[in-house]
């Protein structure tokens, strides 16, 4: 086991690395990554031999050497502010659903870090995170079921004590990340909704005392960690009743005071969440005011929010395009605009006030949907690409939420489960990627007799070429319009080579920097119900509707009864949620045979009555399939295809 201790005192940085089990404490020379160029230019190093030793747990350790790194005579608080810290945290990754996972069935034993199905965390996984270009990692931790309540017989007071073995294992993984040079954010995670939300505001209440006890132990246990390690007080704080902001301020102040009073944490970076880590102006401003007034504008305090984009796009309620209008208002507003608005808000409230920000979680909610391709692949990649760009532009740290559906933790190589999305996420840690301004698929119904132009968003890069094709042959490149032009003869040749509907070509477009872009050429026909595979369903179990997608990718579905929209959210929205009220199975590159399933949650909605329901299914190609479902006495059947 090894640990690194870094201390900053009087303009000096002291670095110590401890290697246990071999009888030696080895000292290393190093500089934390937050050092500015000016600091680096002023640094000087000194080494002095030590002829002493220490004993810990009955084992002797020889002190080989000590190191001093001098940045100069000036103190660094302004240079080492939370703004600078956020910049060097940069692009991060969440070790989600591991140490934060917990079984809530108290009749079953706690399974620890594997409670929600992810395998035990390995050092190789942490190394792979670093190798993928991430510079920070968030390691969420749920304390619930990992502590005991100890009652003092004399006073009758109760003290919460975290399990020592649990803490040791948690710290082991934290130290693996530190050893890789990653900035590490630790926190108290699902406790926010498991018990902390029930706090009534009384500082004598069990929730407040428990929260304080947890941070007393955490602050002490991790006090000798280097400044790479930051403390996030509470994940997504929420409260069942009362003034949520007032309660959160009280908990944040309690954690802050405990951390600062614990030796070794005088300049520890403390991360303060907004209520529910939301980013409405009221939430942002309340947190800014708390940091400025209650925490006296401590330069070693950051703010944190989470960003999952607009729900109707993120969770796929029929809006699948990153540049697709969301709400149909007089002024178009799309997910790209939403992201820009988010960063503008954070910048205006936190950054301009000198407060650094970390987006502790970002992603799209349908990433691990029950539906195949619930997120349109190319449009999902555009979201990640722009997220990385905007975070870098604003000097804000951004940490991708991965609950196990991102990096494959059961794969020896720790590859991405969605390789193309992973490529873009990795590329976005350092720069921009290029892509088609439109959809990642060209749909062709009839034999082409004209060229097809694919406009590109280069984002500062240069177009290099298409794998396996020759510029001037199968395609040309219009540099003035930044567009690839697929020649009619080439399109006709691949069209003729395929008898049925499906994928004609997977074109890999490469650029001077960033991830490659895949543009698919698809032969598409008319989607139909596959009568041979139809079967009746029920309200209780749902209805599977077998389809021949005919080379078309599903986009959205609207359901009507007696001329009115029905189904979950139909009172305010026009489409069903893909992965919830409807589940789509179409996992082939050809978009051939598959199914659309109306789930039990659809039939359970009060708006869905017995009788005929019309389904309007829209595909990315623009084609629409209408069919009728008859519901009677709990049984549902497909009746008509138009």
Question: Model regions: which residues?
Answer:
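Sec-dependent N-terminal signal peptides
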Residues: 13-31
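Sec-dependent signal peptide cleavage junction
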Residues: 29-47
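Active-site region of glycoside hydrolase catalytic domains
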Residues: 66, 209-333, 344-364, 393-394
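Active-site mouth of glycoside hydrolases
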Residues: 68-269, 274-280
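Aromatic-rich peripheral "rim/lid" segments of glycoside hydrolase catalytic domains that contact
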Residues: 369-467, 485, 500-518, 526-535, ...
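Surface-exposed, short loops/turns at beta-strand junctions within beta-sandwich domains
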Residues: 489-504, 590-611
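Edge beta-strands of extracellular beta-sandwich domains
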Residues: 514-526, 623-641
């Amino acid at each position: 086991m090894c640990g690194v201790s870094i201390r900053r005192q009087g303009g000096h940085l002291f670095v110590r690395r401890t290697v246990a089990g071999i009888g030696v404490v080895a000292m290393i020379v190093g500089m934390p990554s937050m050092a500015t160029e000016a600091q680096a230019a002023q640094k000087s190093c000194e080494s002095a031999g030590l002829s002493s030793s220490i004993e810990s747990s009955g084992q002797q350790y020889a002190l080989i050497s000590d190191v001093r790194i001098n940045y100069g005579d000036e103190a660094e608080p302004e240079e080492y502010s939370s703004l600078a810290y956020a910049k060097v945290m940069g692009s991060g990754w969440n070790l989600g659903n591991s140490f934060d996972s917990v079984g809530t069935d108290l009749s079953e034993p706690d399974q620890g870090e594997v409670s929600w199905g992810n395998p035990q965390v390995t050092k190789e996984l942490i190394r792979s995170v670093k190798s993928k270009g991430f510079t920070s990692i968030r390691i969420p931790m749920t304390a619930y079921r990992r502590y005991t309540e100890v009652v003092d017989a004399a006073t009758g007071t109760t003290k919460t004590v975290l399990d020592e073995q649990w803490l040791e294992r948690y710290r082991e993984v934290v130290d693996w990340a530190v050893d890789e040079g990653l900035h590490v954010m630790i926190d108290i995670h699902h406790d926010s909704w498991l018990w902390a939300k029930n706090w009534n505001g009384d500082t004598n209440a069990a929730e407040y005392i428990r929260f304080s006890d947890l941070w007393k132990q955490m602050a002490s246990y991790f006090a000798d960690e280097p400044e790479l390690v930051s403390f996030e007080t509470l994940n997504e704080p929420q409260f069942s009743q009362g003034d949520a902001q007032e309660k959160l301020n009280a908990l944040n102040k309690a954690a802050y005071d405990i951390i600062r009073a614990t030796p070794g944490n005088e300049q520890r970076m403390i991360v303060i969440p907004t209520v529910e880590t939301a980013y409405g102006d009221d939430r942002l401003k309340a947190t800014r005011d708390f940091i400025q007034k209650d925490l006296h504008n401590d330069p070693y305090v950051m703010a944190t929010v989470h960003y999952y984009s607009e729900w109707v796009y993120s969770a796929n309620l029929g809006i699948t395009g990153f540049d697709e209008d969301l709400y149909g208002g007089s002024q178009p507003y799309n997910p790209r605009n939403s992201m820009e608005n988010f960063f503008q808000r954070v910048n205006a409230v936190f950054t301009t006030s000198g407060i650094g920000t970390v987006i502790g979680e970002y992603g799209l909610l349908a990433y691990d949907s029950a539906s195949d391709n619930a997120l349109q692949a190319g449009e999902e990649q555009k979201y990640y690409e722009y997220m990385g760009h905007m975070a870098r532009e604003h000097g804000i740290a951004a940490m991708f939420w991965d609950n196990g559906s991102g990096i494959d933790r059961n794969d020896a190589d720790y590859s991405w489960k969605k390789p193309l999305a992973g490529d873009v996420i990795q590329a976005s840690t350092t720069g921009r990627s290029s892509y088609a301004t439109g959809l990642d698929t060209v749909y062709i119904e009839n034999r082409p007799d004209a060229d097809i132009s694919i406009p590109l968003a280069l984002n500062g890069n240069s177009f290099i070429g298409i794998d396996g094709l020759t510029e001037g042959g199968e395609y040309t490149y219009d540099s003035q319009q930044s567009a690839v032009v697929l020649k009619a003869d080439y399109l006709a040749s691949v069209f003729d080579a395929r008898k049925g509907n499906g994928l004609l070509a997977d074109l890999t477009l490469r650029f001077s920097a960033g991830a490659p872009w895949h543009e698919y050429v698809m032969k598409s026909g008319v989607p139909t119900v596959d009568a041979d595979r139809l079967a009746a369903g029920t309200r209780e179990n749902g209805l599977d509707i077998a389809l021949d997608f005919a080379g078309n990718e599903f986009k959205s579905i609207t359901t009507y009864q007696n001329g009115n929209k029905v189904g979950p959210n139909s009172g305010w929205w026009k489409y069903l949620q893909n992965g919830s009220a409807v589940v789509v199975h179409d996992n082939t590159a050809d978009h051939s045979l598959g199914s659309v399933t109306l789930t039990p949650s659809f039939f359970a909605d009060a708006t869905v009555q017995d009788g005929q329901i019309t389904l309007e299914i829209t595909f990315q190609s623009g084609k629409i399939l209408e069919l009728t479902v008859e519901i009677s006495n709990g049984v549902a059947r497909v009746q008509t295809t138009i």
